Regions:
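Sec-dependent signal peptide recognition
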Residues: 1-7
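N-terminal signal peptide c-region/cleavage motif recognized by signal peptidases
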Residues: 12-16
């Protein structure tokens, strides 16, 4: 479940392409990821602040006109705010200069090089709310970014897994990087052999409606976690499912990636709890050790 924000950021740069060799496709995916971190208008590292709002919560965006780096959220209603965001009656409600906006989930320009976007989210497991990001097109974090860092590509870490679905798709709550909780649905278990070892790895969906499940994700740690791989674990996806449940699907650990929280404090990412007793020397490295 590579972050929908990453997917949204890539929307402006990605286009259908002819089939390419697996390693070339992997390198292209890394290039797109780098763009999603720094280049696109809603790049991840352009986020300057975030407000997470549940039912009845209000936040005010305060800042100095003409100074993009000054815009920050303040809890509650503040007179003179550039923008006021609230979540009420299960819906986002945003006001600019005290005037309600017709579409509170649209991109909102606040100042030169500063815009705001609200997204549906969970403020606790299964509890709806919104997260409202402030984007600064001149954010210094984009200049400091050196690109994502991956272990070398190795086709030996591509497996075909048999899948045992969980017919009930029960909810499972994960502790997040912000010490809140976030709910996903246990879709089933993937069974595969990797480096001569048998693994049974749980996969999760973001909906419990089988007709809407088009991809699955595993949140895993391995023997490299904290020793070259990100300490909160990595994610790997089974994308582009034709239907659910599949009998089998491919897992390519070369694409194992860090949650957005590895580089941005403004996200709430589930902390992995499913362990693989193997050093997975592919996928993304820990950015704090290598950059």
């Amino acid at each position: 479940m590579k972050s929908f924000l990453l997917a949204a950021a890539l929307a402006s740069v990605s286009a259908p392409a002819p089939a390419v060799a697996p390693e070339a496709a992997w390198r292209a995916d890394i290039a797109d990821t780098n763009k999603a971190y720094t280049v696109t208008p809603h790049a991840i590292l352009k986020i300057q602040d975030a407000a997470y709002l549940g039912e009845g919560n209000v936040a005010s965006l305060m800042g100095q006109r003409g100074v993009p780096g000054s815009y920050k959220w303040v809890q509650g209603y503040q007179p003179g705010a550039a923008l006021v965001a609230a979540f009420s009656g299960g819906k986002a409600a945003l006001k600019k200069e005290d005037k309600p906006l017709a579409n509170s989930l649209a991109d909102i320009e606040v100042d030169k090089d500063v815009d705001v976007q609200a997204y549906p989210t969970q403020v606790q497991a299964g509890v709806p709310g919104i997260r409202v990001f402030v984007y600064n097109q001149q954010n210094p974090a984009t200049k400091a970014f050196k690109g994502v860092d991956y272990f070398p590509y190795n086709p030996a870490f591509i497996v075909t897994a048999d899948f045992t679905p969980d017919p009930n798709l029960p909810p499972r709550s994960f502790i997040t990087s912000r010490r809140t909780s976030k709910q996903f649905y246990h879709a089933g278990v993937a069974h595969f052999i990797l480096q001569g070892k048998q693994f049974d790895l749980p996969f999760y969906a973001d909906t419990n409606d089988p007709k809407k499940i088009t991809s699955l994700s595993a949140f895993f740690t391995d023997d490299l976690t904290g020793k070259g791989a990100y300490g909160a674990g990595r994610y790997v996806d089974a994308p582009d499912l034709k239907s659910f449940p599949p009998k089998q699907f491919k897992i390519d650990f070369n694409y194992a990636y860090n949650p957005n929280c590895a580089r941005s404090a403004f996200f709430t990412c589930p902390v992995a709890v499913d362990h693989m007793a193997l050093a997975v020397f592919v996928g993304e490295r820990d950015p704090h050790l290598h950059h």
